Curated annotation (Swiss-Prot):
Disruption phenotype: Hyperactivity and impaired spatial working memory with no effect on sociability or preference for social novelty. Conditional knockout in GABAergic neurons of the thalamic reticular nucleus results in hyperactivity, altered sleep architecture and impaired executive functioning which gives rise to impulsivity. The modification N-acetylmethionine is found at M1. Expressed in testis (at protein level). In brain, expressed specifically in GABAergic GAD67+ neurons of the thalamic reticular nucleus where it colocalizes with ATP2A2/SERCA2 (at protein level). Expressed in the bladder and in the atria and ventricles of the heart. One of its GO terms (cellular component) is calcium ion-transporting ATPase complex. It comes from Mus musculus. This is Phospholamban. It comes from the Eukaryota.
Length: 52
């Protein structure tokens, strides 16, 4: 069990040391924001349809 924890910790450390390019991070953030906006719009449409 301790070995698994150690492996996951070292993997997380390795992943965090890999620096993402600023552009890639910006693109990911934009995608995430767009996705959230689309979800909110769909929810609003569903609520309006149910109310009507």
């Amino acid at each position: 069990m301790e070995k698994v924890q150690y492996l996951t910790r070292s993997a997380i450390r390795r992943a965090s040391t890999i620096e993402m390019p600023q552009q890639a991070r910006q693109n990911l953030q934009n995608l995430f924001i767009n996705f959230c906006l689309i979800l909110i719009c769909l929810l609003l449409i569903c609520i309006i349809v149910m109310l009507l």
